[in-house]
Amino acid sequence: MDVFSFVKIAKLSSHRTKSSGWPPPSGTWGLSQVPPYGWEMTANRDGRDYFINHMTQAIPFDDPRLESCQIIPPAPRKVEMRRDPVLGFGFVAGSEKPVVVRSVTPGGPSEGKLIPGDQIVMINDEPVSAAPRERVIDLVRSCKESILLTVIQPYPSPKSAFISAAKKARLKSNPVKVRFSEEVIINGQVSETVKDNSLLFMPNVLKVYLENGQTKSFRFDCSTSIKDVILTLQEKLSIKGIEHFSLMLEQRTEGAGTKLLLLHEQETLTQVTQRPSSHKMRCLFRISFVPKDPIDLLRRDPVAFEYLYVQSCNDVVQERFGPELKYDIALRLAALQMYIATVTTKQTQKISLKYIEKEWGLETFLPSAVLQSMKEKNIKKALSHLVKANQNLVPPGKKLSALQAKVHYLKFLSDLRLYGGRVFKATLVQAEKRSEVTLLVGPRYGISHVINTKTNLVALLADFSHVNRIEMFSEEESLVRVELHVLDVKPITLLMESSDAMNLACLTAGYYRLLVDSRRSIFNMANKKNTATQETGPENKGKHNLLGPDWNCIPQMTTFIGEGEQEAQITYIDSKQKTVEITDSTMCPKEHRHLYIDNAYSSDGLNQQLSQPGEAPCEADYRSLAQRSLLTLSGPETLKKAQESPRGAKVSFIFGDFALDDGISPPTLGYETLLDEGPEMLEKQRNLYIGSANDMKGLDLTPEAEGIQFVENSVYANIGDVKSFQAAEGIEEPLLHDICYAENTDDAEDEDEVSCEEDLVVGEMNQPAILNLSGSSDDIIDLTSLPPPEGDDNEDDFLLRSLNMAIAAPPPGFRDSSDEEDSQSQAASFPEDKEKGSSLQNDEIPVSLIDAVPTSAEGKCEKGLDNAVVSTLGALEALSVSEEQQTSDNSGVAILRAYSPESSSDSGNETNSSEMTESSELATAQKQSENLSRMFLATHEGYHPLAEEQTEFPASKTPAGGLPPKSSHALAARPATDLPPKVVPSKQLLHSDHMEMEPETMETKSVTDYFSKLHMGSVAYSCTSKRKSKLADGEGKAPPNGNTTGKKQQGTKTAEMEEEASGKFGTVSSRDSQHLSTFNLERTAFRKDSQRWYVATEGGMAEKSGLEAATGKTFPRASGLGAREAEGKEEGAPDGETSDGSGLGQGDRFLTDVTCASSAKDLDNPEDADSSTCDHPSKLPEADESVARLCDYHLAKRMSSLQSEGHFSLQSSQGSSVDAGCGTGSSGSACATPVESPLCPSLGKHLIPDASGKGVNYIPSEERAPGLPNHGATFKELHPQTEGMCPRMTVPALHTAINTEPLFGTLRDGCHRLPKIKETTV
């Protein structure tokens, strides 16, 4: 037995010779009556002897000289034979080195002298141990008369316990002629020992069941181990990858099904067969440690691959995967297995389900649960389809081979989340606290902790490479204490049932050898045997007499300094001192204490006794002693650097390296400190977790469970390819917060993204800020004894922004360039905009930056409306996190946006990715409560909700290019002359859980919080202008017929009702508008089913004879404050309206409306808006024509740039051509030519003309009835929607949400397309 295959042994270093070695060379070990090599014997204070095994770090009382059946080296024999004239020398030699006697000829000269298996070491006094076979043959042939051979029997091999070479030769010469039945019937009864579910075939003969249905029987004695059986089966079955296999016990219990128990290779068959209820068990030879990739196993070992396929088929049929194996997967696997069986047997070229059912039966391929719960007709129908679909697994023209089908079978099966893994229930012990936990152990999960069984959230607790060793100790009743020593921190202590504990330890050790180090065993039965089946180790207090053998006693004192920054001196004391003095008090004192040991040894028993809960520094202190075999132990002030683990370099650390206060005692920095932290600390610590979640899948622990969400490495930051849960709120067991030693996965060898030689740097944190577990010069730094992570706000903001951006990122294929470019442009303009915006007055207004629209830079830039303080709307706490400014550029085009969750399906035209993303994200807004009505101001920065308190427009003249702050209520209640922006109501409160946000919004609040607190009301659009207009140039024109006069809301509800009922324009100052105290859902027009909105359109609309001819009535148009003429509008209309095909009925006009910043005079004289009206605005100043042309130019330029760059999804389902005269996509498309064009027919619909676009008149139904007697029926007839009407504007790009109710709709009957984003040009 290779003693080096169990644990990593600490080395004794020599700085003089620069060499290290442990243990000493075997040449210094004498075969006397002292303990065997690597053992020492000592006595406790009671005088009882016990032994220390340095190979396995065990301390048993049993004498290893009696336990170990020491093998007596075989003695060489000299054999002299004379040549027979017929038979020669009478033996057959092999070709090995040395040459082995294969067989002895009966009746020949060598019979009775040579034994099959003898190794020929000398021929006639010539050594031939290393000689080639030809030389041996020549020497034998050269002996004519006689020959003198020196032979030796080889050392007994593990398989010799079953059959020797000599016995094999005898069996060949005299084979057994009689075969006995396995079931021996005595007096009509079958013996209990030979039943099918029995371990023993007969006394001392173990029967092992293979997955292919065969059985193998092995005779054993008291020293035969499980490993002997495995090696023999490896030879018999020609298996190369034996590391995947193990023996298991299948225990059948009535009513509870079967249970598989892993057997450790060091267990003896005697121990196994003497277990209670062994007569109800079977021994199985199985692949217990499945490979990650079945193709890799196929390349390395085809025999093991075939065995894995057969075993997997049996597991599926026998329902060993439980409820996780769904019916659809079971049917697909059965279809593949049927195909493989038919192709392999080559009975027929055609895959016939009838033939398969007749030949094998469906029960051979399907679990009984499927056969019992599904109708046979449906099963056959599904299988017939799936058998034919198997051909789709290969390219067309090629036939699926049986080997390919097996690979696909195993790949389908490997998707099961319990494939090769197991779930364990255990009790986690932390000092005095005990908590029930659920662990998941598997090749893809390592040792994972099921944090929340309701949401099935799982986090990686420790990777297999992080586990140094596993120890088991018997507890009360049937419980066993399992200690998982992970890295160099405090071990994980679990209380489990004995069978589960054994399975956990064996499974972890098996995967460690498979995936990490095949030469090392991290779990040894010696540890379990010392505690569970034998007496416990000695007391490690008091004085002990150490009987040190010569192999490890150092004759002189040697002192050298430890590595690195350590100051601890390692002293080897003269071996004449034969005592070990350990104080009776706790081994982790605050003052300086010493442990004097004159012989180097590592003792787990000492470690177990010296370790106290919550005293991690002391434990790590002693672990350094145990691993390095140090002979001097100082207090915490001279802690040693722990011996690095075999994979210690591949450790990524979680918390920063924060200095520990000298006044803090080590026990206060344990698990309890982290458990007592509040949510704030947990929120800080979550930023330091990394959530890669490459391949984690769900796990069905119970039939009701939907599936466990695996978030690799991350406990609180649930970012991955699975459903994300509420971060810290969704965690029911905050236990991983205390034992999250392993931040990286054990896929460090395969797919670890962390460097193996460096500490992991989280975010932008510097490398010195990461905890380095390899050592410290002052205090031992333990992951469980660190203060909460700290950091400046910038780091927290950066980490949180990265976290939220990762969550809120659009799905793959649904991202447009506006996401990146907007954030870049905003970041670039942030410093100067912040400085410019300091003079503005409304810094305290919370603003939700939904979409920042960059515009082309041309002309003079105006200062932004406000510092865009990103905050959640309607939040209980207004947390302002970041200020973003962007210059308001009025070069000619300002794109205004309104999100409408109500839209019809695509009308057949092209729909770009941004439109679909926004539509799908906003569609869920219909389900949310509507409890806020808020106005939004659309500027170049985004949409700014205007506070209800600030409802006043400044009456003074604004600075050059400046735009006065606007408010929601003022915009809603002010007359047309006081309204610089267009007011467009939003019928729904946008409250979406899946809304895409800009990066600024994500800086402080999490996406979940944002979604839960987002409430959006009516949306106001404002478009600023770079030019100031004169009042005379913008004088409004109104048709003579005034019986359909539009109404404007007044300062109060009463005034508003009276003025609108009288059909006259009322005028109020901008200050009076703040008295509108009831701007609620009931008073807004869009909240009533029968209410309609009417848009004050351009002055050019007043002269549209087509519209007037329809009913003979038009609405008076409010006076414009900006210089906007009908000619300019008519010239700009073709370019501005050609993109709004979808969403407009034929003849429906959404005219572009450009608002110019008004001067003080405009605001002070609102009466001028009503002073003059005329039938047609026939006379237009030349200056206005130039302005209109300039607007037309900028509109066309901006439209082309937006369409080419893909900003804000301009390439939507509407016609995207700027010059197109009409969109013809579907019934939702409409003529986009100007109204005066003969192509646009007249309909009985009226829009309020507005030369300047300074406001929108919305008229409740009860107030509109007397003023608009002829239009109520018309609107109801043409637009039979229960929801409120919305204004009509020119919409170059319309975005729609699928399957939602209309919000910004048209008046056309049967319109299937409603605009989502409306844009206004300047």
Swiss-Prot record:
One of its GO terms (molecular function) is phosphatidylinositol-4,5-bisphosphate binding. One of its GO terms (biological process) is positive regulation of synapse structural plasticity. Residues 78-155 form the PDZ domain. Residues 204-519 form the FERM domain. It is found in: Cell projection, Dendritic spine. InterPro entries: Band_41_domain, FAK1-like_FERM_C, FERM/acyl-CoA-bd_prot_sf, FERM_2, FERM_central, FERM_domain, FRMPD1/3/4_FERM_C, PDZ. Gene3D superfamilies: 1.20.80.10, 2.20.70.10, 2.30.42.10, Phosphatidylinositol 3-kinase Catalytic Subunit, Chain A, domain 1, Pleckstrin-homology domain (PH domain)/Phosphotyrosine-binding domain (PTB). Changing R102A: Abolishes the interaction with ARHGEF7. Mutant overexpression in cultured neurons does not induce a significant increase in spine density contrary to wild type. CDD domains: FERM_B-lobe, FERM_C_FRMPD1_FRMPD3_FRMPD4, FERM_F1_FRMPD4, LGNbd_FRMPD4, PDZ_FRMPD1_3_4-like, WW. Positive regulator of dendritic spine morphogenesis and density. Required for the maintenance of excitatory synaptic transmission. Binds phosphatidylinositol 4,5-bisphosphate. This is FERM and PDZ domain-containing protein 4. It comes from Homo sapiens.
